């Protein structure tokens, strides 16, 4: 078989041949030298230098690329030191290198870094040279002899294939690079070069007189660079330069061919801890643990049936006052009081509102002339005036400017000849004449004398490259060269030992809130509470808690394996693929909402003053000014004589508080007035009785974050979540490593010579090249160490919105954000509950006087004022009070209805009334504004560790994990045999009750609890701020009796009667009907005033008389006694919350709450199964510089600790054929095991290791199997919580047995009062009784409870039988009475009671009834209950009624509960 290894070997050979060929080709071309400049120093291409100790640079094609030196960890060298000028620590000489030892001890902890060593002494300075004359540059020397050809360092071991096994013992390790010495002084100048060649002749100058040779001039500026010469022949390849440092990361090259299979590598360092192996067989049960932490609150159970009535509660608190009764009939009109004394002058009234604008007044008197206005603008030009008279002749003017020269005159005759001038200067050279014909060759002259040697001519242009000279003789050995630059980077060393764990980082800031998590699984049900005292038998009570688990039964034997089943359902979906390419851009989003209006802009600068406008017309008269303040009061004048009565004035301001009158009879109910303004604050009322419990308030602000709780116990393995949706497309990756150097291109055309530019800065790394063709997939390499975290990439393009993710767990509360911009007003919210009163604010400054308010309602009657000073005698009074009643006149016709009176003027605020009784609780006020968050409370005590979470379902295979460190390969051991089933452990003690769980969602309303005892008095509340005016309410109930109605119109005056003797007070006569109001009669003459007679007997009620005139006001009387208690005032604002009342008696068990909110994420689960090997990781960081090229030396690889002497020849795994064979066996075994496991999932066997979900599943997969005991795991996931059940293979029923199926036959209960028969629950109320638990021996009750919950969900019907053994105890039918009054009660698992008669859904049937009478012999009754409401079964308790006497005994057989 052509293996993968062979293929790789072939490909590697091909790659090597190609590369070697490429190197040979590259050597034939001449690559012009390229230089780099850094810090004023010039370096050649491929030069390497270290500008700083920990930085290394290389000249690469004119670019300086620098990188930080990465030091190897010196793990096995505690005293490592950094030599001066070096970057990396090295072992001092005495330390043992790892290669010297064959075994190493356990690695010690990492030592502290040693102190930095002292700097070495500087080298001695060089000798000063003698300054020489500057020599001329010599010609290029002959090329040196060719260096020995070097092989590429990386290929040496592959080309040599072998390895010198003998040399392994002494693999030499190159020492660290020494520090560079100080720069020496300049050396002596070189000797002057030889005479240069004769330069070409210059152009001929003009012939001058030949002067003497001048001194040598200064050198001219350098000429322009000449054109490039033609290419010379290629020189011999130079010696191989020192290797350059690691280049910058190049663009990714195309994938190379796979190399040959390398030698077997050393054993890697210890790998990261492997994934947890498969769960081992169940160990022996441990000793009972301490009580566990309280469990989380369980899920809300189904609502129970109506519970039995509880015992009567204590008397309730006093109820609220009843509603106000209907108004009584109007009382009789009281007598009018005498006129009072004139009151004192009232205080100045409040300023009235501003009056309406008056009509326009007459035009005012003309005003004073205004000040002169500013000058107006220039007016337009006027019309031209008429011509003036001609003026007199003027004086002569000044002479004018000289005129322009005239035209030239005619030419004059020639003048006489002048004398001859001196000779002119020498003319310029004439243009060169045409060249003459070539003359004959002259005779050879005598050699002239040797001239003075001229100065060397200027350097000629560079000649063409001469032909290659013969190699010269070998020169003397040169002086030792300066220290070479660092070599090229070697292969990366093997991974170092993992360093010690770093210190814990600081706590990070809270992350953003995660997405809402998916709902957690239902928590376990809480433990059963202790039995309460037995109350009177009531109507059915709420369901009781689950009973304790009985001791587990012995485990049954595993059944035999069945035949293979039919193919199973389709497997789970595979791992999600990598994200697809980015989709097309989505449609543009909706237009955003309108933004918040911006803040007002700054006020602009004032404009320039405009020009004054024309004077406007006078304006209309202004409105009347405000009324001036009242002047000071004048001194009081003497009382004048009373004047005649004026017309009735407007209603005066309310007088001072009068004496309280007697309480009038209640008048008819008045119309409901509008709601007045809130009165002044009343005196603190006594605290009212505790009101009913309010609705849950809105959740308060989050408190300050408490101290972190103690870490909870680790939860069991949670299920890995479903794989998330593909994330947004990541940013572009880092550039790939530098590709191989390309072949040299053809020579370009000659460019025009440019000037040398200043060297630019190093350019940025180029963009990534195009992706190479995919190489063949290599074998999965060992995992490399995780690279450092990269910088955060730029945000990618926004992807299309994904589907909503699953809800995340609730995140911690974020920090308070900055206040947002003010939003637009929202819709009016629903009326909130009353907030707690805020703290009283500081007293504000007095506000400005407000507008006059609307008149308030009439104030309450004030208390009596102090008696006023006696006034002057008043004016003559009006007519006195009516005389005694005359005889009744005939009833008059009914008068017309009077108009509704106008609203009275606002009274002054009366003093505070007496504290009223506490009114009924007012309606909730509107929600107060949200108070500012309170100061952080003190940190809470650490919470108790949370309970272990339930194991989650197994998640989908995760994405490939990060590449782990390379581990030592261990061969897998053979699978062990499963251990024997351990004996069952003793059941642990019951744990303490758990803490209260988080509040569940509001359940359906429970039945009313018993009345709580009244709470302690609350402290008085502060006033709430007045609420806004409410909407007009609906008509309220009839109010209390109103004030006495207005008196009717006066009747006619009867004749004065005689004064009768004073009779004794007669009994009150019945109230007569109110007669119709008579018409007003004329006033009769006033009779003389008689003596006051004694009160006569009460006559029949007369017709209502006319209204008398008001009498004079009497002097103020003494204060009256307090009136009767008035009706309750309107309910005051809610006071602050009082202190908590004393605890009420416990209410009935409430219904189970709804599931609480999802808890915080559990502790990190166990490491999941190993994922598939990931793709190769990114290239690791560059390794340290390699040794100089030549051969390849493996000595720099750190030798791992080895047990045997290291065998240098076995570097490569493929060299050992046994390993491959073992590996194949291992793969085969794994595949077989996997296929077996998959088969087990598709067709479960019902064994402990491979349980089915239900017996129905087993029946479908294995229809020919017999009924018997099998293992099932309804909640799937880990099979450690599987339970053993009986499977009825005829029907597919799953039957779960009770842990204690029999109740002994004996006397279980003796009643204190045997005649008073009532149902007594066996498990709850009888001594040594227990509630029935299920699941068989050895099973954990909590596991069984969960499994039963799942089993109920997957079933449509449940049934159970119970056999009641009796002696003198009726179980169902009472033979004596023929009825079912004495029948048993059963309690279902949801605490519902199942009876013998009543609602057919909650009644059981009897298949055999042998307990109908008291015969003194044992009998039995078989009870059966079948239901489609699977939550009612299994039965957990039984209550017989006919027990309690000493001769009454019973026992029970509890049958299995079967689900179908």
Curated annotation (Swiss-Prot):
Disulfide bonds join 1255-1287, 1295-1458, 1366-1411. Glycans are attached at residues 261, 1104, 1361. Residues 481-490 have a biased composition (Gly residues). GO terms for biological process: blood vessel development; ossification; response to mechanical stimulus; skeletal system development; skin development. Residues 34-92 form the VWFC domain. Residues 1225-1460 form the Fibrillar collagen NC1 domain. Residues 175-1188 are annotated as: Triple-helical region. Contains mostly 4-hydroxyproline. Proline residues at the third position of the tripeptide repeating unit (G-X-Y) are hydroxylated in some or all of the chains. The modification 3-hydroxyproline is found at residues 881, 1160, 1175, 1178, 1181. The C-terminal propeptide, also known as COLFI domain, have crucial roles in tissue growth and repair by controlling both the intracellular assembly of procollagen molecules and the extracellular assembly of collagen fibrils. It binds a calcium ion which is essential for its function. This is Collagen alpha-1(I) chain. It comes from Canis lupus familiaris (Dog).
